[in-house]
């Protein structure tokens, strides 16, 4: 698979484009992890491109009428925007699972790449979520969290490198299946619903669905590693957030004491 910017994803290439190329009995060097991630997006993009090009006009969902509290098309009407949006997200998850689950199970190389990309996405999202939160500024908590997060990522066997003593995966970024789910959901629900704040509120749910999709498609060992890594990351976040809160209280207490002196 190769990345096609015109469709924002993948197009098919011959099997020889994967990491190991056989020529006269000799294995060639592995491609970079970043290139592997691009191939995953390329594979996904090809399917999305076909979806957008070949969808019949009468198969598209009807226009959403928010004022009439009725969502028409092939979906059950509802007056709750969040419920309707979640329905479209769930439908997108089903469609992506139908396409990708067999590929992950049958294509070992693609399955490995999706597995590693999902681990990297969990790492990257946790790092951004923690470090961009003003509540974690106090003390020296952020560097300590990143170091602990890197150690957890290293323990999964992800490829990466130490940068100033902190392990960083080579392919940190967005879960490619989450991207596919979101693009499909956008297409199903239409621009009016996709612009609503309820859709943004449901993105953590969509991300979790993407992780669950991958975990359910993987062999047991990798599935367990994926689930355990996510649980470890959640524990680390909770632990270091408490540390940041304690540090913030200590700083405020010291400031108040100095003012009263």
UniProtKB/Swiss-Prot annotation:
UniProt keyword annotations, A-Z: GTPase activation, Guanine-nucleotide releasing factor, Secreted, Virulence
Q: Is Secreted included in the keywords of this UniProt record?
A: yes
GO cellular component, as recorded: extracellular region
Xref: Pfam families: SopE_GEF (PF07487)
Which Gene Ontology molecular-function terms are recorded?
GTPase activator activity; guanyl-nucleotide exchange factor activity
The record's annotation in InterPro entries points to: SopE, SopE-like_GEF_dom_sf, SopE_GEF_dom
Q: Where found, per UniProt?
A: Secreted
Q: What is one process in the GO biological process aspect for this record?
A: actin cytoskeleton organization
Record's subunit section: Monomer. Interacts with human CDC42.
Family membership: Belongs to the GEF (guanine exchange factor) SopE family.
Which function does this protein serve? Answer: Activator for both CDC42 and RAC1 by directly interacting with these Rho GTPases and acting as a guanine nucleotide exchange factor (GEF). This activation results in actin cytoskeleton rearrangements and stimulates membrane ruffling, thus promoting bacterial entry into non-phagocytic cells.
Q: What is this protein called?
A: Guanine nucleotide exchange factor BopE
